[in-house]
């Protein structure tokens, strides 16, 4: 199974979600965002946007993806967000998918549900098998 790279803020919603997936995890550290990964991965990222959709992708994630090696190895993105933000719900995953030319594999709200976890586990299993 592939690697999950994720960023989680102080709320811990994304970290909680990925911890339930039973996958190998690599957390993007705010203090060391330029660390390089050396294998294909799926990125799990929350959205942080102002009232107009600006700054949706966390800066630390932008710095991580600006590293050529990291950007080259991304295979898909999963987004976390809050539906209260309407059209900006999961905007970060949409932006990353578009800019990195990878599929947005799934979107979940807040910490996700048990159903979300099951869907993502099954989806990742199929996804990684397709890539091999």
Swiss-Prot record:
Q: Where do the TM regions start and end?
A: none
User: Which GO biological process entries does UniProt record here?
Assistant: protein modification process
GO molecular-function terms, A-Z: FMN binding
Q: Which Gene3D superfamilies does this chain map to?
A: 3.40.50.360
Give a Pfam family name: Flavodoxin_NdrI
Domain of life, source organism: Bacteria
Tell me its family.
Answer: Belongs to the NrdI family.
What is this protein's function per UniProt?
Answer: Probably involved in ribonucleotide reductase function.
Q: Spell out the protein name for this chain.
A: Protein NrdI
């Amino acid at each position: 199974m592939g690697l999950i790279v994720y960023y989680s803020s102080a709320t811990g919603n994304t970290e909680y979600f990925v911890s339930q997936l039973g996958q190998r995890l690599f957390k993007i550290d705010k203090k060391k965002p330029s660390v390089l990964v050396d294998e294909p991965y799926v990125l799990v990222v929350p959205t942080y946007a102002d009232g107009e959709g600006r700054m949706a992708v966390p800066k630390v994630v932008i710095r991580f993806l600006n590293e050529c090696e990291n950007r080259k190895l991304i295979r898909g993105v999963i987004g976390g967000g809050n539906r209260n933000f309407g059209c900006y719900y999961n905007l970060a995953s949409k932006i990353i998918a578009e800019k990195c030319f990878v599929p947005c594999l799934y979107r979940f709200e807040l910490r996700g549900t048990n159903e979300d976890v099951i869907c993502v586990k099954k989806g990742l299993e199929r996804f990684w098998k397709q890539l091999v």
